[in-house]
Design a protein with these regions (language model features):
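An amphipathic, hydrophobic-aromatic interaction surface with interspersed Lys/Arg
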Residues: 1-209
């Protein structure tokens, strides 16, 4: 039923709205990707949200096996999220293949964890993967991002103009957390993103009292 629904051109817009991505990206989906999304969208019937990656590992030539973030982005370093989310929002506005490769390279890490130098080094290797696989990963992240925004509504207000100032706003958040403690800047960058979101939520609530 889902396949029949999303295969109609008129429903591209509906799927784009549900995923919060441009309709032109949805139109490029293959039937296989639609099928995978049907599995992901099974949460509609269960009234649940997608909070984990379907593709948990990527085998990259000369780079080994890379791993997706944990479900609910648990233990994902805040700075990794800043990079990933910035690339994702940029790709949603201007879907360049280079941006897509950066998104996936920063999203998937070795077993040892995220490292910016490693992520940058893997971009060229990610380029060799099938573009449809990379786009499916981007779509999956979009679903997880939707789950995150609903979990932390004060951090992600629905009517904010996030597309225009998204990258700078995350850097502002990071700078506010670090404050004058510049010597420990790297330590703050490693704080789990969910802990940062809880901290921001707490501060917003305190500011409203």
């Amino acid at each position: 039923q889902f396949l029949a629904l999303t295969s109609r051109p008129d429903d591209h817009e509906l799927l784009a709205v549900m995923l919060d991505i441009p309709k032109r990206i949805v139109k490029r989906l293959s039937l296989l990707q639609i099928h995978e999304l049907a599995n992901l969208f099974d949460f509609i019937k269960r009234d649940q949200k997608v909070s984990s990656f379907s593709l948990t590992t990527l085998r990259i030539p000369s780079a080994g096996i890379l791993h997706s973030p944990n479900p609910k982005l648990q233990e994902m370093p805040f700075m990794q999220f800043v990079y990933v989310d910035t690339f994702y929002m940029s790709y949603a506005v201007d879907p360049r293949f280079e941006t897509l490769c950066k998104l996936v390279s920063y999203l998937y890490s070795p077993k040892t964890g995220f490292n910016k130098i490693t992520a940058d080094a893997n971009i060229d290797k990610i380029r060799k993967l099938d573009k449809k696989t990379l786009e499916a990963i981007s779509l999956n992240y979009g679903l997880i991002r939707k789950w995150i925004t609903e979990r932390y509504p004060l951090v992600f207000p629905k009517h904010s103009n996030t597309r225009k100032s998204h990258d700078s706003s995350w850097l502002d958040v990071f700078d506010n957390i670090v404050g004058d403690d510049l010597k420990d800047r790297d330590k703050y960058a490693e704080v789990p993103v969910n802990a940062v979101f809880r901290f921001i939520t707490k501060k917003i609530k305190e500011g409203r009292k």
